[in-house]
Amino acid sequence: MAKKTLKVTQYKSASGRLEAHKACVRGLGLRRIGHTVEVEDTPSVRGMINKVNYMVKVEEE
């Protein structure tokens, strides 16, 4: 059975944000506005997304 993945897209800049939020964006693998990555659906990834939900858009697959 394939693992569930999430498509995460950054739509706001991380500059000028809290260091912890910048680290979460980096931890998700996002580098710039408009960048999209596919990440595994795990509790730790969900926590990072939840922390920076005002900067990213999420699509479930």
UniProtKB/Swiss-Prot annotation:
GO terms for molecular function: structural constituent of ribosome. Belongs to the universal ribosomal protein uL30 family. Part of the 50S ribosomal subunit. It comes from the Bacteria. The keyword Ribosomal protein applies. InterPro entries: Ribo_uL30_ferredoxin-like_sf, Ribosomal_uL30_bac-type, Ribosomal_uL30_ferredoxin-like. This is Large ribosomal subunit protein uL30. It comes from Teredinibacter turnerae (strain ATCC 39867 / T7901). GO terms for cellular component: cytosolic large ribosomal subunit. Keywords: Ribonucleoprotein, Ribosomal protein. GO terms for biological process: translation.
